[in-house]
């Protein structure tokens, strides 16, 4: 039997992460929530408070996502390093336990940034690379399988390998995700679902997400892990 690992990760620290966490708990699926405590893209009322992050950490892994969510390659090295280190220190003080996982805002990273994350004491860093069924060879550029979002740019890669009826189905990200998961069951590998709770809400995709979670949950010979447990 080939090894199959399922992991999920959710970015930004939005208050809707609590709704997402409840769904994951219902289906007994592991998850890592990447928190940017002062995320500049949202008002304070839209972000999880420290107390709510602590509550989330009792069931799920908490990872760092910088303090304010800048695109790190666009800022000076000193600012990038401070964002990375401060986010780790903030969360470790808040949670009173090690924070080993990091996620680059927008997935944007460079070799220099990977080195900064490593030097800050993280064990791994997740990107937003999609379409992979493995954990990658670089712990500081970990890829994903599918984003819980409709990326039309993902569709052309399937044009030559699927007939028109299949193409109609995979236009839905959740249907594509189920097909990729089923392939993973056959071939082995890592199925890594990621997304944003606020994005799922904006797109009214809670039903789709729940159907996908029900499909991948409680499978024999499947190991459910946090991102930090991948490395």
Regions found by a protein language model. Give the residues of each.
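Metal-dependent polysaccharide deacetylase catalytic core of the NodB/CE4 family, i.e.
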Residues: 27-115, 119, 123, 131-159, ...
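Non-membrane alpha-helical structural segments and their capping/turn regions in soluble enzymes
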Residues: 77-82, 167-174, 178, 203-206, ...
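A conserved mid-domain beta-alpha-beta active-site/ligand-binding segment of alpha/beta enzyme cores
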Residues: 145-180, 185
């Amino acid at each position: 039997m080939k090894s199959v690992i399922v992991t999920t990760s959710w970015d930004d620290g939005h208050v809707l992460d609590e709704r997402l966490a409840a769904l994951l708990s219902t289906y007994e699926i592991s998850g890592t929530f990447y928190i940017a405590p002062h995320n500049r893209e949202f008002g304070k009322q839209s972000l999880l408070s420290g107390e709510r992050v602590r509550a989330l950490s009792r069931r799920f892994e908490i990872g760092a996502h910088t303090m304010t969510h800048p695109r790190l390659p666009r800022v000076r090295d000193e600012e990038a390093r401070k964002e990375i280190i401060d986010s780790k220190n903030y969360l470790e003080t808040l949670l009173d336990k090690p924070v080993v996982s990091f996620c680059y805002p927008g997935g944007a990273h460079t070799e220099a940034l990977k080195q900064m994350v490593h030097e800050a004491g993280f064990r791994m860093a997740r990107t937003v690379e999609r379409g992979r069924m493995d954990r990658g060879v670089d712990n500081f550029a970990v890829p994903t399988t599918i984003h819980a979002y409709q990326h039309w740019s993902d569709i052309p890669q399937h044009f030559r390998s699927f007939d028109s009826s299949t193409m109609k189905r995979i236009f839905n990200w959740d249907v594509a995700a189920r097909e990729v998961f089923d392939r993973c069951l056959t071939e082995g590998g890592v199925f890594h679902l990621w997304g944003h709770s606020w994005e799922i809400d904006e797109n009214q995709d809670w039903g789709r997400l729940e159907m996908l979670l029900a499909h991948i949950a409680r499978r024999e010979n499947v190991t459910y892990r946090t991102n930090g447990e991948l490395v």
